[in-house]
């Protein structure tokens, strides 16, 4: 998703005012990512967090495959919307950011819903084709 989605300032303000409130660990991830410099561009926006949460919740989704986890903001946003028996399989090739993400998942007590796999996503998916 990234920051390519064009959301007007007016829409962004509305979403922030009336949308879901962020979990404390989501806020912590955002603050952590602010310190990362340019690489933080891989973080999704707050409105995208809320949108993912809403889609998962309204659609009653129970299983999610995420490709690219970074420090876990989008993953955590979806996990918070999943039922307690829901599951996210999160593929990412970066061991360092994955370790950071897993720590955030534990802190938010959502790690039981999230299985992270360190892999090149394309290769992993090709190997598991049916």
Task: Give names to the regions the model predicted.
Residues 123-130:
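Conserved small/polar residues in nucleotide/adenosyl-binding loops
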Residues 36-44:
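Class I SAM-dependent methyltransferase Rossmann-like catalytic core
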Residues 29:
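Beta-strand-loop-alpha "switch" segments that mediate conformational coupling across diverse proteins
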Residues 25:
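N-terminal glycine-rich anion-binding loops that anchor highly charged ligand groups
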